[in-house]
Amino acid sequence: MNYFEGTVLGLVQGLTEFLPVSSSAHLRITAALAGWDDPGAAFTAVTQIGTETAVLIYFRRDIARIVRAWALSWTRREMRKDTDARVGWLVLLGTIPIGLLGVTLQDAIEGPFRDLRLIATTLIVLGLILGGADWYASKGRPRGRHSLPRPRKTLRDLSVRDGLLYGLAQSAALIPGVSRSGATISGGLLLGYTREAAARYSFLLAMPAVLASGVFELKSIGGDREGGDGEEVSWGPTIVATVVAFATGYAAIAWFLRYISTRSFAPFVLYRVALGLLLLALLAGGAISADAGAAAD
């Protein structure tokens, strides 16, 4: 990987990490279409340190408040009923499923899960699920001849059950093409949360798992380590990609939260389905192979 590739992939990572379109799928597809080597799961995980740093800075006041309340809840019983303390505990609870599955499925994540046929399929399927969840969230409750707005939850309503279900939804993002934010936001909408609450909790929930994964994969960068193509993944381009991902990721968070406050997820649904169908067409036509850029067995 050279510095130009690192810059482009960092830009892709930052622009797509927080949108429900799957950053890992876009990194894989971009490299395949450009004729580059597969950057690999380790590169993806490390560059996500940049985007999660953007989350830390963007939500710094919320995070500081949550951490403080969570810490106080260890010694002060009354704090255990505090919303921020509960969010802190449930973020940790929701991280357990993806942590366990990430370790168990590591070989699949770095190998079969990166098959472009699987990625195309998950782009389409999760896109349809997101569309259904968004439709459900906007659909009114029938009452006689009329329909009333469906009551929506906020983070104040977050329960242990919901926290665990959010965590299970996040686990699906181990497959490129699913999208961490897409899966957790869809889950949140189906559980009855507002778009804004589902998105905010999605970003907060991702931090422990993504940062831990990125730090864990640092050992796979540089030296004699290899990416998905069997070639060395160098430190220089990876650092550049991470910095670019941070800058573009911060802008993407701000834009996305403003966007969903007044609009639906329909454009993202259409984009996911169209991209998945295009990818399947390219694969069927032989323009690219399902394992393009991957290491040979």
From Swiss-Prot:
Subcellular location(s) per record: Cell membrane
EC number in record: 3.6.1.27
Sample GO molecular function, one term: undecaprenyl-diphosphatase activity
Origin organism lineage: Bacteria, Bacillati, Actinomycetota, Actinomycetes, Frankiales
Any one GO biological process: regulation of cell shape
Alphabetized UniProt keyword annotations: Antibiotic resistance, Cell membrane, Cell shape, Cell wall biogenesis/degradation, Hydrolase, Membrane, Peptidoglycan synthesis, Transmembrane, Transmembrane helix
Similarity remark: Belongs to the UppP family.
Additional record remark: Bacitracin is thought to be involved in the inhibition of peptidoglycan synthesis by sequestering undecaprenyl diphosphate, thereby reducing the pool of lipid carrier available.
Membrane spanning stretches: 39-59, 89-109, 118-138, 203-223, 237-257, 268-288
Catalytic activity of the protein: di-trans,octa-cis-undecaprenyl diphosphate + H2O = di-trans,octa-cis-undecaprenyl phosphate + phosphate + H(+)
Domain of life: Bacteria
Enzyme class, UniProt record, top EC level: hydrolase
Topology term for the membrane: Multi-pass membrane protein
Record gene name: uppP3
Chain's role: Catalyzes the dephosphorylation of undecaprenyl diphosphate (UPP). Confers resistance to bacitracin.
Record protein name field: Undecaprenyl-diphosphatase 3
Cellular component annotations (GO), alphabetically ordered: plasma membrane
